[in-house]
A protein has these predicted regions:
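Cofactor-binding loop segments of dinucleotide-utilizing enzymes, especially the Rossmann-like FAD-
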Residues: 76-80, 102-103, 151
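Active-site-adjacent beta-strand anchor residues
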Residues: 49, 77, 129, 149-150
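Nucleotide phosphate-binding/pyrophosphate-handling subdomain across enzymes
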Residues: 1-97
């Protein structure tokens, strides 16, 4: 998207459209579940379908940029065929709490598998629940400032449904 930045030569020739309408269209574009933020019960909640190590690192960068010095509780559920040990251990490096869960799909890793894969520092609390609903309910009762639901699309979708959050916001 660098081509959409002001001052990039020949933007209008490359995209065959004036710069301002393209910029405005991009500003209105929504990516549900991609660093989607809202407030629920006085708690900042972030939904992000980070389901590979690169996406987890991007999520962590965004969290530290947008919420510096804030404690984070992660609700995580991953598919069994993903690199969840690397992702969980990256999260554990910054998390105050990690709540593991299993979305309702046969492809999902079991909470016990996730728990065995993570080696958190002493100050990071790790718990596990058999469902996303139970994990989210526990996370809302937790003390960290930020609740971040991440992992698979299934996990984020179930959490959004449990919390009554729409995947898109109205632009009107």
């Amino acid at each position: 998207l660098r081509i959409l930045e002001p001052g990039v030569p020949d933007v209008e020739q490359v995209v065959s459209a004036p710069y301002a309408p393209v910029r405005d269209a991009c500003a209105r574009t929504q990516f549900p579940g991609r660093f989607q933020c809202c407030m629920i019960g006085g708690k900042h909640v972030v939904f992000d379908v980070a389901h590979n190590p690169s996406a987890i690192h991007a999520l962590l960068h965004s969290l530290t940029h947008c919420y510096p010095e804030r404690s984070v509780c992660f609700v995580c559920g991953f598919m069994a065929d993903k690199e969840y040990p690397a992702m969980l251990n990256a999260l554990a490096g910054v998390a105050a709490e990690i709540i593991l869960c299993r979305p309702d799909t046969i492809r999902a890793a079991l909470p016990s598998q996730l728990s065995e894969a993570v080696s958190p520092p002493e100050e990071c609390i790790v718990t596990a629940f058999e469902s996303v609903d139970a994990a989210v309910a526990a996370a809302l009762r937790s003390s960290p400032d930020i609740l971040c639901v991440t992992g698979s699309f299934y996990t984020v979708g179930e959490a959004m449904s449990a919390l009554g959050v729409s995947p898109v916001t109205s632009l009107t």
